[in-house]
Amino acid sequence: MNLNMLHDNVLIEALEECNSSSPIQLPDSAKKKPTQGKVVAVGPGVYNHSGNILPMTIKVGDVVFYRQWAGNEIEFHEKKYIVMKESDIIAKEA
C-alpha cells in the first residue's frame, strides 16, 4: 500500500456480509452499509496541547467495528476503501 494517512485517519477495507441465498435483490441505496473492516493504513496520530503526538491505538491488520455512516469512501488503485477518524471506530477484535 503506497498511501500514507495523515493525523488520526485510518484506511479500512470493508468486510461485507454475504447474503447471496436471498432471492430478493435490494438496490444499493437500500442495502445496509458494512460496519466491520480490516485496517490497511493508519496515520501517526494527533498532536496534544504540549506538541507531542498521541499514538494510534489501531494498527494495520486489526479487524475493527465502526459506526454505520462513519467515514468517506475513496477509490485507490481501482479498489474501494473507507477513510475515517480513529474516534469513529468503536471496537476491535482482540
UniProtKB/Swiss-Prot annotation:
What protein am I looking at?
Co-chaperonin GroES
Pfam families membership: Cpn10 (PF00166)
In UniProt terms, what function does this protein have? Together with the chaperonin GroEL, plays an essential role in assisting protein folding. The GroEL-GroES system forms a nano-cage that allows encapsulation of the non-native substrate proteins and provides a physical environment optimized to promote and accelerate protein folding. GroES binds to the apical surface of the GroEL ring, thereby capping the opening of the GroEL channel.
Q: Where in the cell is it found?
A: Cytoplasm
GO terms for biological process, alphabetical: chaperone cofactor-dependent protein refolding
Q: Does the keyword Lipid biosynthesis apply?
A: no
The record's note on quaternary structure and interaction partners says:
Heptamer of 7 subunits arranged in a ring. Interacts with the chaperonin GroEL.
This entry's Gene Ontology molecular function terms read: ATP binding; metal ion binding; protein folding chaperone; protein-folding chaperone binding; unfolded protein binding
Family of the protein in this entry = Belongs to the GroES chaperonin family.
Q: Which UniProt keywords apply?
A: Chaperone, Cytoplasm, Stress response
The source organism is Ehrlichia chaffeensis
Task: List cystine links.
Answer: none
Q: Which residues form a coiled coil?
A: none
CDD domains, per this entry?
cpn10
Q: Which NCBIfam families match?
A: PRK00364.2-4
The record's GO CC annotations read:
cytoplasm
Q: Which InterPro entries match?
A: Chaperonin_GroES (IPR020818), Chaperonin_GroES_sf (IPR037124), GroES-like_sf (IPR011032)
